[in-house]
Design a protein with these regions (language model features):
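Active-site pocket scaffolds in enzymes
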Residues: 29-156
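C-terminal substrate-binding/cap subdomain adjacent to the FAD-binding core in PCMH-type
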Residues: 24
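Long hydrophobic alpha-helical segments that form multi-pass transmembrane helix bundles
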Residues: 10-21
C-alpha cells in the first residue's frame, strides 16, 4: 500500500503514556512523513519515539483539505491488486492505525486469524482531546447548533 495523498505536514504527537500532547509535530524527515508516496510498512519499525510509543502507526495527521470534501484528503494503493481507496472528508484529521494490537486471536472470514499488523484503518476525525487543547479545532457543540460531517471512502 502506498501514499496518503494530501496528508498535511504535521501530526498530533503522543507523550510516553500515549496521551496527546496538544502540539503539532512536523513530519518532514520522520517515518510519519507520507507526503511523498511510499509503502506503509517501509518505515513502521524505525527507531522513532512516536512509532515506539504505539508500536507502529496509530496517529492523527492534520489534513490539508481543511473541510473540503471535493478532493481526496488521503489515498492508499495496492500495486499487487491494483485497488485504490481515496478518502474524502470534511473532518480536519485522519487517524491511521496499522493493526498493532492484533495478536492472531481474533478471526475473520473463513475463521482466518488476524495476525499482528495485518490491517490498516483510515479514520476521519477531529483531534483527540480537542476540548482541552486550545490549538486544536473545537469540538464543542452548543445548544441549537447542528454538527455535520461527511466522509466518503471511494474504491477504484
Amino acid at each position: 500500500s502506498r501514499g496518503l495523498g494530501d496528508v498535511y505536514k504535521r501530526q498530533t504527537p503522543y507523550d510516553d503514556k500515549k496521551c496527546v500532547t496538544g502540539e503539532y509535530l512536523p513530519v518532514a524527515g520522520t517515518p510519519l512523513d507520507f507526503r511523498m508516496p511510499h509503502t506503509i510498512g517501509e518505515r513502521i519499525d524505525a527507531d522513532y519515539p512516536q512509532l515506539k510509543v504505539v508500536n507502529g502507526y496509530d496517529h492523527t495527521w492534520e489534513l490539508n483539505t481543511k473541510g473540503d470534501d471535493t478532493r481526496p484528503a488521503a489515498w492508499v494503493y495496492d500495486p499487487t491488486s491494483g485497488r485504490k481507496m481515496e478518502i474524502f472528508t470534511t473532518e480536519p484529521g485522519i487517524q491511521i492505525y496499522t493493526g498493532n494490537g492484533l495478536k492472531g486471536k481474533m478471526t475473520g472470514k473463513r475463521g482466518i486469524a488476524y495476525p499482528f499488523r495485518s490491517a490498516v484503518c483510515f479514520e476521519t476525525m477531529h483531534f483527540q482531546d480537542s476540548p482541552n487543547q486550545p490549538e486544536f479545532p473545537s469540538t464543542v457543540l452548543r445548544p441549537g447548533e447542528v454538527f455535520h460531517s461527511h466522509t466518503v471512502y471511494k474504491f477504484e
